[in-house]
Amino acid sequence: MPLNREDKQAVVAEVAAQVAKAQTVVLAEYRGIAVGDLTTLRAKAREQKVYLRVLKNTLARRAVEGTPFAPLAEQMTGPLIYGISEDAIAAAKVVHDFSKSNDKLVIKAGSYDGKVMDKAGVQALASIPSREELLSKLLFVMQAPVSGFARALAALAEKKQAEAA
């Protein structure tokens, strides 16, 4: 059932609000995907706080107008699903991971930091560890010398106690 003008304006406003908060937008062609698989993809996207939506391309073009994602409008052709995320890599990671297990979902393009990326760029973005993973690695690297120093002091204290006894 076609949308009337007010419904279209509401959809554009909703998507524009998501795009205004977003750091990344990923476009993927979903031709031939079963409904169950699409539902699985949506559930994974929700877990990662990725806004995922099948949208008419004309409405999507209107939603990205005047944003850093406007150059992406040239890529908006064919049946597309739009992944929009405030996290820099979450949308790319969700769509890329799903496309590995389902060859009917084809990554078409993406945009990050005002730059349009092709499929390889989106895959490269998806391969970057999440912020939490990077922070935990940094913490481990910073903590290792301190814990090593603490173990050395404890061993020295034990040695002094053994010599004193």
From Swiss-Prot:
GO biological process, alphabetically ordered: translation
Protein origin, superkingdom: Bacteria
Annotated InterPro entries: Ribosomal_uL10 (IPR001790), Ribosomal_uL10-like_sf (IPR043141), Ribosomal_uL10_bac (IPR022973), Ribosomal_uL10_bac_type (IPR047865)
Pfam families linked: Ribosomal_L10
Keyword RNA-binding: yes
GO cellular component: ribonucleoprotein complex; ribosome
GO molecular function: large ribosomal subunit rRNA binding
Keyword entries, A-Z: Ribonucleoprotein, Ribosomal protein, RNA-binding, rRNA-binding
Role this protein plays: Forms part of the ribosomal stalk, playing a central role in the interaction of the ribosome with GTP-bound translation factors.
Assigned protein family: Belongs to the universal ribosomal protein uL10 family.
Subunit structure: Part of the ribosomal stalk of the 50S ribosomal subunit. The N-terminus interacts with L11 and the large rRNA to form the base of the stalk. The C-terminus forms an elongated spine to which L12 dimers bind in a sequential fashion forming a multimeric L10(L12)X complex.
NCBIfam families: PRK00099.1-1 (NF000955)
Protein name: Large ribosomal subunit protein uL10
Organism: Burkholderia mallei (strain ATCC 23344)
Gene: rplJ
